[in-house]
């Protein structure tokens, strides 16, 4: 891995803030020991996704520190920092390219590894049913012969993309598009089985979907208002 064999990356946010014109996130303080699965919950606009994009280095914080195994994010080269995270965000758009090109770059293409990722994400049956398999184009508006994917199948492709990258820290933004409960449950359990021995963050709107997480942090109004285990938060009357 990017950390010289360290797959259990401890994450720490120290007084992290982000100022926009009319919005300030934080200050956020959160410690996740290596190997923790943490749920981040809160309403839309509560700051969860912004916090995670700060953690991934996609946004720069206004103040505060991010530590990975005690080392400041500022002390990493941008490439080595980027390689620490596999993140699946809901605002991701598939490009009008082949399925394979949407999952990995040409220089990184490994067919065996790609199909292992499809398998773990539960989408290999669909890919194998297509005449051109992973070389099938996506996006019907651009290519007449492109494959159609349901909301649940797109989620699985996003999960396959994160699995293919296989970074030490995995982040999954809960599907905002309504998936049926069975499809949603399948995404949780596949995510859960894949993140064994990794540090993982699961972004959700509901406490109930984070029952599998070791720790849950609750966002409200751009602040971290409480954190604990699923049971502790239920006991505290968490929403």
Predicted features and spans:
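Walker A (P-loop) phosphate-binding loop of ABC-type ATPase nucleotide-binding domains
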Residues: 43-46
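Helix-to-loop junction immediately C-terminal to a conserved catalytic motif
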Residues: 56
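Conserved beta-strand
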Residues: 13-16, 23-33, 64, 134
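C-terminal portion of ABC ATPase nucleotide-binding domains
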Residues: 133, 189, 211-239
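Conserved ABC transporter NBD signature motif
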Residues: 64-71, 81
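Catalytic Walker B motif of ABC-type/P-loop ATPase nucleotide-binding domains
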Residues: 170-174
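ABC-fold ATPase nucleotide-binding domain signature/coupling loops
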Residues: 67, 124-157, 166
């Amino acid at each position: 891995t990017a950390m010289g064999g360290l797959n259990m990356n401890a994450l720490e946010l120290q007084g992290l803030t982000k100022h926009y014109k009319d919005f300030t996130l934080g200050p956020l303080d959160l410690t996740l020991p290596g190997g923790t699965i943490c749920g981040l919950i809160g309403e839309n606009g509560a700051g969860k996704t912004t916090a995670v994009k700060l953690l991934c280095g996609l946004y720069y914080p206004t103040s505060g520190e991010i530590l990975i195994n005690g080392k400041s994010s500022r002390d990493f080269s941008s490439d080595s920092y980027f390689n620490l995270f596999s993140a699946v965000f809901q605002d991701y758009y598939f490009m009008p390219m082949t399925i394979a090109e949407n999952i990995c770059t040409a220089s990184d293409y490994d067919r065996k590894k790609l199909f292992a990722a499809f398998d773990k994400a539960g989408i290999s049956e669909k890919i194998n049913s297509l005449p051109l398999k992973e070389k099938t184009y996506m996006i019907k508006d651009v290519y007449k012969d492109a494959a159609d994917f349901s909301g649940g199948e797109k989620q699985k492709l996003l999960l396959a993309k994160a699995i293919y990258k296989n970074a030490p820290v995995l982040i999954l933004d809960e599907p905002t598009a309504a998936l049926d409960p069975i499809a949603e449950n399948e995404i949780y359990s596949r995510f859960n089985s894949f993140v064994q021995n990794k540090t993982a963050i699961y972004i959700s709107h509901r406490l109930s979907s984070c029952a599998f997480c070791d720790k849950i942090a609750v966002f409200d109004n751009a602040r971290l208002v409480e954190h604990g285990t699923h049971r502790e938060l239920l006991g505290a009357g968490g929403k």
